[in-house]
Amino acid sequence: EITLGLSHLIHKVLNPRAPFEFTLERIKNCAWANLPLSMAVALLFKKRFDPRGPMDDATFDAECAKLTSEIDRTASSETSRTVLLTMLDAVRHVLRTNYHVHGRFGFAVRLDPKFLRNDDRPALPYGVFFVHGRGFDGFHVRFQDIARGGLRVVMPRSEAQHGREAERLYDEVYGLAFAQQLKNKDIPEGGAKAAILLEPGAGIDRCVKAFVNSLLDLITPEPETRNQIVDLSGLDELIYLGPDENITPDHIEWVVRRAALRGYPLPTAFMSSKPGAGINHKVYGVTSEGVNVFLDVALNAVGIDPRKQPFTVKITGGPDGDVAGNMIRILDRDYGGNAKVV
């Protein structure tokens, strides 16, 4: 399980460097073809975070050096060598894991964000969580300690589509979280985002619950869970989620109930847009209303009165998305036939 989870994680590091060399299948094949080495990495991970007696830094560094030498000497190919060394580097950057938590629903790690940094991801997030479970992978990224952002579920219909989505999963979460960080420049909360990528046919309810439970494993201060986790970060962390694509009111209510059951200190704040509390941003189209204000000003600035003259609009997204779907409705409400979506 550790080897498989790390394989899915390092895919997000290696694939941007060489998409054809480092497909997910090739990464997993390299791990299986060098099983003694990949198992040694997994065993090191297991010992490092064993709550009964975690490996100290000096011993860990010595074991990493020894294993690096072994990989350099015996890996079956240069591609395999890169895969195994990156897997070992991933272990170095793990700050917390739920691997030893009894009754867990997925394999989760809290990462040092430097592990996923590259030239296309120059801004360093405050925190990154990765969860691998049966039928899904998921990330949560935030750019400040206190940050809010939506949780979305990506549901590909085919293996080919899933492969494309897997390649861009972290970049999508990173990009959306960073955009939210910029949008939130004038308020105390920073930007965050979470996304769960489902394999075709995987059940959305089970995967959402497994992802959320795995996050709670790593952040709840509940003593029984905390005693099963070795924390190298020294941080008490709070996460604030909001509903995004494919998250239903039933999911929202379950998430809040589960957070309370797991001893999370602020369960009602763990997920926003709860039925019966506050306003439903989706129903009122809050974000889309703001976009429409900017659109109206921009059109008038270039000499187009949108209430009297026709204009065309290109929307990146779709009617199934919260912002785009509400935007189409608002365009029709305010501008009628003058607004032509292309």
Mark where each language-model region is.
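Short beta-strand elements
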Residues: 126-146, 256-259, 331
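Often metal-dependent polyanion-binding catalytic scaffolds in large enzymes
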Residues: 1-128
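An acidic- and aromatic-residue-enriched active-site/binding cleft used to recognize and process polar
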Residues: 244, 318-320
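Dinucleotide-binding/catalytic capping subdomain of oxidoreductase cores
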Residues: 321, 325-342
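Hydrophobic Val/Ile/Leu positions in short beta-strands of Rossmann-like dinucleotide-binding domains
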Residues: 313-315
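Function-dense linear segments that define catalytic or interfacial modules
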Residues: 133-135, 141-165
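Domain-scale recognition of functional cores that engage charged ligands
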Residues: 3, 285-293, 321-325
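Glycine/serine-rich phosphate-binding loop and adjoining beta1-alpha1 elements at the start
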Residues: 136-138, 160, 165, 173-311, ...
